[in-house]
């Protein structure tokens, strides 16, 4: 186990030139494509952990309507395709989940729309 940790430490500390040399050796002698090897070595364990933890779906949570409650109700109504009463109930019941399972760009867009209307919004 100690040998593997030492090996991992050496991989993480490689320079760009050394990574390129390693990629060449892996391709020529072992048939491993250099792009996959270079990415794996250059990323290191910290970057790999961060990529694994990055979420692919987000929930948009309305924390509060703020001072412009009417504008927020209208924005929620439009964004969710709800009736006026349902949108008002959602805003009145804050904190509440406006939409679940959105892609990051969709969630950011909805968050921006609601914040422009005056709401306090959080992505989870």
From Swiss-Prot:
Family under the similarity heading: Belongs to the bacterial ribosomal protein bL12 family.
UniProt entry tagged with the keyword Ribonucleoprotein: yes
Record protein name field: Large ribosomal subunit protein bL12
Pfam families linked to this entry: Ribosomal_L12, Ribosomal_L12_N
Keywords, sorted A to Z: Ribonucleoprotein, Ribosomal protein
A GO CC term assigned to this protein in UniProt: cytosolic large ribosomal subunit
Function field: Forms part of the ribosomal stalk which helps the ribosome interact with GTP-bound translation factors. Is thus essential for accurate translation.
Coiled-coil ranges from the UniProt annotation: none
Subunit structure: Homodimer. Part of the ribosomal stalk of the 50S ribosomal subunit. Forms a multimeric L10(L12)X complex, where L10 forms an elongated spine to which 2 to 4 L12 dimers bind in a sequential fashion. Binds GTP-bound translation factors.
Organism of provenance: Bacteroides fragilis (strain ATCC 25285 / DSM 2151 / CCUG 4856 / JCM 11019 / LMG 10263 / NCTC 9343 / Onslow / VPI 2553 / EN-2)
